[in-house]
Structures are given as C-alpha cells and as structure tokens.
C-alpha cells in the first residue's frame, strides 16, 4: 500500500494532493484527520476499499475498533443503516487484516 502512489497518474495526484497537502496542514492531529477522513468516506458510500484502509489507519494510531463502532453509531441517523452496516463490515475487515 505504501507504494500505491507509483501505480499511475491518479494515484500520484492523490498522494501529492491529499497526503502532501491536507495531511501536512496544521490544526488537527493525525488521529483527528484520520477520523474525519473515515467519517467522510463512510458517509459518501461506495468506497469501501478506501474506508477499510482508513479504518486500519485509525486503528494504527489509536482509534480502536470499539471507538470506530461508536463513531458509526453516532453517524447512523445522518447516513442511514446501509452505510453504517457497510462501515462496520469495513472495520471488521480491517481488524482481520
């Protein structure tokens, strides 16, 4: 995954824009940035591979499975059951990896 940015021009743009710009700005901690990214991807839907990757990223920096499940539960009234259930599946998949 760390070398994915080399796999084509869109991946290079993604790495340069998101991780070279947004993730280097001041004001939010890395844990807060990962959580915001996780929430946005969860609400957007249709991007489960990215949601799984960011669930794993969250867990790697201390936002554990139980915390992420609570976040999903908090967002449920706004994003609905299908996206919430998909997010929980992504969290569980990230735990298994």
Task: Go through the PLM ranges and name each one.
Residues 57-60, 66-68:
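C-terminal structured interaction module
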Residues 26, 39-45, 58:
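Short, glycine/charged-rich beta-strand-loop motifs at protein surfaces that mediate ligand recognition
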Residues 32-42, 51, 68-75:
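Short, structured motif recognition centered on aromatic/hydrophobic residues
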Residues 50-51, 87:
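Non-heme di-metal
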């Amino acid at each position: 995954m760390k070398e994915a940015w080399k796999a084509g021009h869109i991946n290079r743009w993604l790495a340069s824009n998101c991780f070279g710009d947004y993730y280097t700005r001041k004001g939010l901690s890395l844990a807060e940035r990962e959580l915001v990214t996780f929430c946005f991807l969860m609400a957007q839907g249709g991007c489960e591979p990215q949601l799984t990757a960011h669930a794993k990223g969250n867990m790697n920096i201390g936002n554990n499975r139980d915390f992420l499940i609570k976040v999903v539960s908090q967002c449920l009234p706004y994003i609905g059951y299908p996206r919430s259930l998909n997010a929980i599946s992504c969290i569980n998949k990230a735990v298994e990896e």
